[in-house]
């Protein structure tokens, strides 16, 4: 797969469930798989969705062995998408080497749906105001230290619930979790000027980190809180 299809790497779902009677056995198995992948392509990503009661001790060890670990900080980004800046809007966990953080994922609610339902002030009713926060919210994540992920259609402000369905797009029903969703192509999202503006701005933000000023994001950056 790495050579024939040129994939970038692998993500292991629920890696804390790997066979083994001890945590050491699980981490040894993960290390074995990681070494096998790196033997084929030393630049390949090897990402673990590693939760469980021992993740606090497991994950630093796995990261020290060259792997990356999934870390869910979606609640903080949902808060800022909705315009609520309380204690829940804390990005500190998204600012760490070795932890893949994200605003949205296949398991979590869409930020723009949350903003549409629970947004502060006019964000709940003003679509343009909501969508103008899409690129800003992504910048809050991808410009921090460490690896980050962008989930599909996040960049155009997809705003139907993870619990919606194509047949009843406005109905919230947990039975629809894995149902087919309204298509952004059918909805005309890629013809929307304001949505494509967010798409372009997010691409520029990512290029700032990866192509224009990569040296700024390498090493150990200085972090400071600036008030006033």
Predicted features, each with a name:
Residues 88, 119-138:
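Aromatic-anchored helix/helix-loop segment that forms the rim or "lid"
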Residues 14-103, 108, 130, 139-143, ...:
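Active-site-proximal helices and loops of the catalytic beta/alpha 8
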Residues 114-116:
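Short acidic, glycine/proline-rich loop/turn micro-motifs
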Residues 110-112:
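Short, solvent-exposed loop/turn elements at domain surfaces
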Residues 9, 45, 151:
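Hydrophobic "anchor" residues on beta-strands that sit immediately upstream
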Residues 1-21:
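Active-site groove signature of glycoside hydrolases
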């Amino acid at each position: 797969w790495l050579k024939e299809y040129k994939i970038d790497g692998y993500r292991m779902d629920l890696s804390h469930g790997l066979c083994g009677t001890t945590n050491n056995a699980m981490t040894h198995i993960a290390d074995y798989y990681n070494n096998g992948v790196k033997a084929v392509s030393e630049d390949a990503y090897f990402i673990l969705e590693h939760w469980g009661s021992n993740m606090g001790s497991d994950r630093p060890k796995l990261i020290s062995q060259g792997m990356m670990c999934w870390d869910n900080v979606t609640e903080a980004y949902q808060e800022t998408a909705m315009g609520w800046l309380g204690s829940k809007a804390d990005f500190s966990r998204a600012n760490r080497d070795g932890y893949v953080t994200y605003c949205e994922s296949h398991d979590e609610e869409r930020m723009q749906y949350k903003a549409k339902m629970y947004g502060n002030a006019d964000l709940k009713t003003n679509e343009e105001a909501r969508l103008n926060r899409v690129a800003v919210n992504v910048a809050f994540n991808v410009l921090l230290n460490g690896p980050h992920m962008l989930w599909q259609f996040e960049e155009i402000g997809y705003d139907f619930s993870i619990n919606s369905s194509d047949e009843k797009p406005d109905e919230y029903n947990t039975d629809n979790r894995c149902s087919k969703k309204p298509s952004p192509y059918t909805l005309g999202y890629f013809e929307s000027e304001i949505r494509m503006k967010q798409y372009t701005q997010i691409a520029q933000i990512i290029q700032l980190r990866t192509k224009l000023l990569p040296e700024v994001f390498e090493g150990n950056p200085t972090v400071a809180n600036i008030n006033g």
